[in-house]
Regions:
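Cationic, low-complexity basic patches in intrinsically disordered or flexible, solvent-exposed regions
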Residues: 7, 32, 37-38, 42, ...
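Conserved catalytic-core segment of NTP-binding enzymes
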Residues: 54, 155, 160-246
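N-terminal phosphate/diphosphate-binding loop that engages ATP/GTP or pyrophosphate donors
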Residues: 45, 59-136, 140, 145-148
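Hydrophobic anchor at the beta1->P-loop junction of P-loop NTPases
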Residues: 48-49
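C-terminal lobe/tail of nucleotide-utilizing enzymes
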Residues: 204-286, 290-301
Length: 301
């Protein structure tokens, strides 16, 4: 079985980002000031987002959970909203949860209900799934559920829904929840064609909101990457000034198989990284086009 590998050892400098993508949405053009939580209320853990749906967020989250649990760490998984109920799981659970949600719950030793507070049938974006059910998702409910999941000393792994700008509610995105929780971010991305643009856009959107991005994780990372995959890895690391790691193909969705892959990732170091102090001055007030994600768009502290 292929295992995760750390692809980049160089640690990027501590930086304050002032660039943002022009025209993604009005919300990117007018960022809210970041509200700092008291230290006692900040959960310990990681927020896993992705460049798209189906890019390996769940496998990455499950591998991290299994590796931490195997190392004796108390862990909890949290998924703000699950859609697509009714799909066959095929992983030994009688409930008709989506297969990836079953995998996430099993890795944390939790039931599907414990992992996800909100659940809907159609496999569509959360805000639409709620509308189709005649409901409205309230941001306060999402935040309360996430903070409740983080109660105690457990390490919390939050898996986002789709990409960073997917609306959880009509006016509330995955990014908004990540900002409110103040968890460091991991970005799951494909290693193949198209990933450079998708990953750098996600990275820019995260940094524009003041999120602390620890690394990009390419998944599944092949045992023998081709020239394009190696170039994609190096280009993302260079242009994004970001650590890039790789999670190998998990061939067996067992706790042992997931733990083996996850333990090859530097999760201990990621969790031990001190939170970067991000002041309101680092959050852009006006939209500015991104000409370069390297030195021209950062201020070295």
């Amino acid at each position: 079985m292929s295992e995760g590998v750390e692809l980049g050892n160089a640690r990027p400098p501590r930086v304050a980002y002032r660039s943002k993508i022009s025209g993604i949405s009005d919300r990117l053009a007018h960022e809210r000031p970041r509200t700092q939580q008291p230290e006692a209320q900040r959960p310990q853990g990681l927020f896993v987002t992705g460049t798209d749906t189906g890019v390996g967020k769940t496998v990455l989250s499950a591998a991290l959970l299994a590796a931490m649990a195997a190392a004796g760490e108390p862990v909890r998984a949290h998924k703000p909203v699950v859609t697509g109920l009714g799909e066959e799981s095929g992983i030994g659970e009688s409930e008709t949860w989506p297969p990836d949600h079953v995998l996430l719950g099993n890795a944390a030793g939790m039931t599907g209900e414990e992992v996800a507070p909100l659940r809907y049938g159609p496999a569509v974006s959360p805000h639409l799934a709620a509308q189709l059910a005649g409901e409205r998702i309230e941001p306060a409910r999402l935040l309360t559920a996430a903070r409740s999941a983080a109660a105690g000393d457990d390490i919390l792994i939050v898996e986002g829904v789709g990409g960073l700008l997917v609306p959880l509610a009509v006016d509330y995105t995955v990014r908004d929840l990540a900002v409110a929780l103040e968890l460091p971010l991991l970005i799951a991305a494909r290693p193949g064609l198209g990933t450079i643009n998708h990953t750098l856009l996600t990275l820019a959107a995260a940094r524009a909101a003041g999120l602390d991005v620890l690394a990009v994780v390419l998944t599944p990372w092949p045992q023998r990457p081709n020239a394009m995959e190696r170039s994609n890895r190096d280009t993302i690391a260079h242009l994004g000034e970001i650590e890039v790691a790789g999670l190998g193909q998990v061939r067996s969705p067992t706790a042992a198989g997931l733990a083996s892959a996850g333990d090859a990732l530097p999760w201990r170091r990621w969790l031990a990284l001190p939170k970067r102090l991000i002041s309101s001055a680092c959050v852009p007030r006006r939209s500015e086009p991104v000409r370069n994600l390297r030195k021209s768009s950062v201020n070295i502290l």
